């Protein structure tokens, strides 16, 4: 973005740029504020450049309460997107829990992963299509199996034993290097509590 980087550091989204080539940011600009700081693992994360040239990200229950581009917003636990210049923020998909995983297939469809036994969601119609009065989930879980298979015997889990308790990544197999049976049909989902 504008020759620099965007950083999520709750309560702010920041823009940094090195202008003299010394690998240090000479420009530090607050794009907007309002991200919750009550629980750091539930804040904004997993920023990715989308097919629509917006920057997409995830947030958990720490949520967002603020104003961007003259528009007041309040949301949590789902997927959002911002314009790279920070002039606009949109909440796109409501999930049911802390959201960390975010992925796209070759068509630009959006997928996500959350905590507590919800490893894969499909994000169909965005929340923005429903208007401001609509509440509720705009993403649906599509995982057919919630279990994971760690390669180490001693894992620590506190809630969803032998299942995803922290689906923290979502990468759809899109490469022609994968077998045809994988392409656009399989997602790789990390699970930190199972060392996956």
PLM regions with names:
Residues 1-196:
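Beta-propeller domains with acidic blade repeats across secreted/periplasmic ectodomains
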């Amino acid at each position: 973005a504008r020759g620099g980087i965007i950083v999520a550091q709750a309560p702010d989204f920041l823009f940094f740029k090195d202008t003299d080539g010394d690998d240090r940011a000479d420009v530090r600009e607050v794009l907007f504020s309002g991200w919750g700081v009550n629980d750091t693992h539930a804040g904004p994360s997993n920023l990715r450049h989308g097919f629509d040239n917006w920057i997409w990200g995830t947030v958990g229950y720490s949520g967002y309460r603020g104003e961007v581009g003259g528009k007041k917003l309040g949301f949590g636990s789902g997927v959002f997107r911002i314009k790279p210049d920070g002039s606009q923020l949109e909440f796109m998909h409501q999930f049911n829990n802390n959201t960390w995983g975010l992925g796209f297939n070759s068509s630009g469809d959006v997928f996500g992963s959350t905590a507590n036994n919800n490893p894969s969601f499909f994000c169909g119609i965005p929340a923005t299509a429903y208007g401001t009065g609509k509440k509720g989930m705009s993403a649906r879980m599509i995982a057919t199996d919630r279990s994971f298979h760690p390669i180490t015997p001693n894992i620590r889990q506190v809630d969803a034993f032998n299942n995803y308790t922290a689906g923290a990544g979502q990468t759809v197999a899109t490469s022609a290097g994968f077998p045809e049976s994988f392409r656009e049909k399989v997602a790789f989902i990390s699970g930190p509590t199972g060392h996956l």
